[in-house]
Amino acid sequence: MDHTQQSRKAAEAQPSRSKQTRFCDGFKLFLAALSFSYICKALGGVVMKSSITQIERRFDIPSSISGLIDGGFEIGNLLVIVFVSYFGSKLHRPKLIGIGCFIMGIGSILTALPHFFMGYYKYAKENDIGSLGNSTLTCFINQMTSPTGPSPEIVEKGCEKGLKSHMWIYVLMGNMLRGIGETPIVPLGISYLDDFAKEGHTSMHLGTLHTIAMIGPILGFIMSSVFAKIYVDVGYVDLNSVRITPNDARWVGAWWLSFIVNGLLCITSSIPFFFLPKIPKRSQEERKNSVSLHAPKTDEEKKHMTNLTKQEEQDPSNMTGFLRSLRSILTNEIYVIFLILTLLQVSGFIGSFTYLFKFIEQQFGRTASQANFLLGIITIPTMATAMFLGGYIVKKFKLTSVGIAKFVFFTSSVAYAFQFLYFPLLCENKPFAGLTLTYDGMNPVDSHIDVPLSYCNSDCSCDKNQWEPICGENGVTYISPCLAGCKSFRGDKKPNNTEFYDCSCISNSGNNSAHLGECPRYKCKTNYYFYIILQVTVSFFTAMGSPSLILILMKSVQPELKSLAMGFHSLIIRALGGILAPIYYGAFIDRTCIKWSVTSCGKRGACRLYNSRLFGFSYLGLNLALKTPPLFLYVVLIYFTKRKYKRNDNKTLENGRQFTDEGNPDSVNKNGYYCVPYDEQSNETPL
């Protein structure tokens, strides 16, 4: 008899175990698919950031416009983020994420399309390409050439083709579409993950997710490094006819290849989400035997949430309920402080990262390929390790909400302190005759002064808009052979095989020759290696606290409002940080330019040369200005968090058990959505 009853119970238990297994397998598949989508999302972001300088040169636009293009991703995200976050949680979240990944892939491919319609890239005037020895490049006494640029007839003729430069608008549209597609991935993905993870494992899953996502930036940096060394029109022109190198300020790599690869990967990542369930199967009893992830609420919060729940039951997607929910999070003092704090921090991060590669190129004389490779190989693995370590520390020591705030405050303070060490590493301006030095290469000049012609080139009637830099034997770079006073040349138009002679402005122990290309900056090589070490250190401490920031956000609001809170947070961050930060960073950087290119229409194009010192102080100073207020706001955040949870300490719950870790709600189940092993379930409500 007993044996028969045991067999019957075992038979009844088997389907539950099978259902639980399917549930766990579905969660693991979702976690794997979400990780892949995070990789693709991060890959696309790095590809855009690392291509900023090349996009500026290809479309002949200033940094403020390239900042707008970069902010297009956030503009697209901004258009739909709130509605996706609020209404998306009530729909099929995995399928919405899949649709988003597909749209993100289409947007990435659209970004690359202008390359195929713009024609070949012309890095110099057509008549200059034909012959290096013509009168526009070398100095011929009393030649009839305008010193300020080409004639109006030439400008008007070239301006018809110049209309293609407006193709950058399609790059902006593609980036906006990529932002729209990315919208559901973070709020819906993390809320789905939090709903169905095992109890106490949310922080660990988030740390793992962000660590795996670091594969995307690594691939992005390596891929961008490889493609940056490939000429933009590879496959269309004879590469032997290209006389510029990656060290030249006019060089444009195959930036479009990175976007095509990323687009195909994003489309592939969308496929698994269409085969995942809306909600994993679970019994009603499991739903009843679970409690909220959020900490016990005060009586006022309970009453408020009861009213919200009643309204949601009447019409879960009406606008009145949305506005009431929005008001609920905006009256949460912890949430508002956290919102302002992260807005400033993220603005500094987005703005600095957008122009990080330009900073390295201009400050230390490195190519885009070298900057991408080193950052991808060294910095990104360090950040991945720091993110995983940060998530592990929070879980291992079971940090409360106050503890998490203190932990992030510590990591942010250390990273902030190390940033002051960047300033001694700034390099001096490039020795550039006519821009930072007089034309004889002897005396420095202020960058805002229009340097007058010297005795050595005043009779050459040179075109000052001409950009064909040469390196003199005296170590000074000249804008063109004509402005160096060179009378003759020998070579095959290649940088290492072309020499200019009889250069009256060059004086170096009787040797007055020069070769094609800019002079290298050997003095900054040591500073660059110290910069990399410092960058790794700052990145480590910055990344260590990033997973914990998400936990502070989720624990500051009621569980029912998590998706909306994350969505509204993303809305503000993207509107005021993601969109505006690259634009005003770009505007600050444009003010440090001392030599602009001239478009075929005679208008200002991309910057050829920056004042290195002014660039460095503007870039680093703006970073510190945005990251100083958050340190004080962390103190305020800790104070309000302590005050909120102090009144809940050691409160006796309705079932007679005490909640001893109210500041650590991560150790509590969320509405029965967690994958609790069958043999661990009991008749008691798990806390």
Curated annotation (Swiss-Prot):
Which residues does this entry mark as bearing Phosphothreonine?
T660
* Record GO cellular component, one term: basal plasma membrane
Tissue expression per record: Liver specific. Expression is highest in central perivenous hepatocytes and lowest in the periportal region. Isoform 1 predominates. Not detected in heart, brain, kidney, skeletal muscle, lung, testis or spleen.
Tell me if Nucleus is a UniProt keyword of this record.
no
Annotated disulfide bonds: C456-C486, C462-C482, C471-C505
Q: Which PROSITE patterns match?
A: KAZAL_2, MFS
The record's function comment reads:
Mediates the Na(+)-independent uptake of organic anions such as taurochlate, bromosulfophthalein and steroid conjugates (estrone 3-sulfate, 17-beta-glucuronosyl estradiol, dehydroepiandrosterone sulfate). Also transports prostaglandin E2 and L-thyroxine (T4). Shows a pH-sensitive substrate specificity which may be ascribed to the protonation state of the binding site and leads to a stimulation of substrate transport in an acidic microenvironment. Hydrogencarbonate/HCO3(-) acts as the probable counteranion that exchanges for organic anions.
Q: What is recorded about the domains? A: A conserved histidine residue in the third TMD (His-115) may play an essential role in the pH sensitivity of SLCO1B2/OATP1B2-mediated substrate transport.
Q: What is this protein called?
A: Solute carrier organic anion transporter family member 1B2
